[in-house]
Amino acid sequence: MYGNGPVFKAEGTSFRDQPYAEQLPQGLWTTGLCDCHEDAHICVQTAIMPCVSFAQNVEIVNRGTIPCMNAGLIHLALGFIGCSWLYAFPNRSRLREHFALPEEPCRDFLVHLFCTPCAICQESRELKNRGADPSIGWLSNVEKWSREKVTPPIVVPGMIR
């Protein structure tokens, strides 16, 4: 078992036993907070519909346990009263934990309080750079990883033997 969820298998072996599609260093962000220009699609989507980009990230970071639609609606509702950052910053913390990323450029709640769109874009790019495509959802990513016989990029440090 991996955490509380199932072990993902490809031809009888656990994904934990397979190499990563791309070995990216833990402890380093692959993209900066203000590097929105690196992915125009994510940038435009987040500028127009931040709740959609955020919800896609939530589904991946939480390994499909929080449906995209639910996360998006909650983010949208909280956005109307200016509090979406309260729901968003814990997801950034989870993402950082998965990849042992530093809390930069400041505390997660401050990043989301003062720059939610930039934070959402950075988190989307980080997932994409590490092999997860937030736009296709968790199950489609799992199917893709199974076909390619690679380890899912979502790994909690200390959980692998």
Curated annotation (Swiss-Prot):
Pfam families, sorted: PLAC8 (PF04749)
Subcellular location: Membrane
Entry function: May be involved in heavy metals transport.
Mode of membrane association: Single-pass membrane protein
Coiled-coil boundaries: none
Gene Ontology cellular component annotations, sorted alphabetically: membrane
Taxonomic classification: Eukaryota, Viridiplantae, Streptophyta, Embryophyta, Tracheophyta
Record-given protein name: Protein PLANT CADMIUM RESISTANCE 12
Membrane-spanning segments: 71-89
Keywords for this protein: Membrane, Transmembrane, Transmembrane helix
Family statement: Belongs to the cornifelin family.
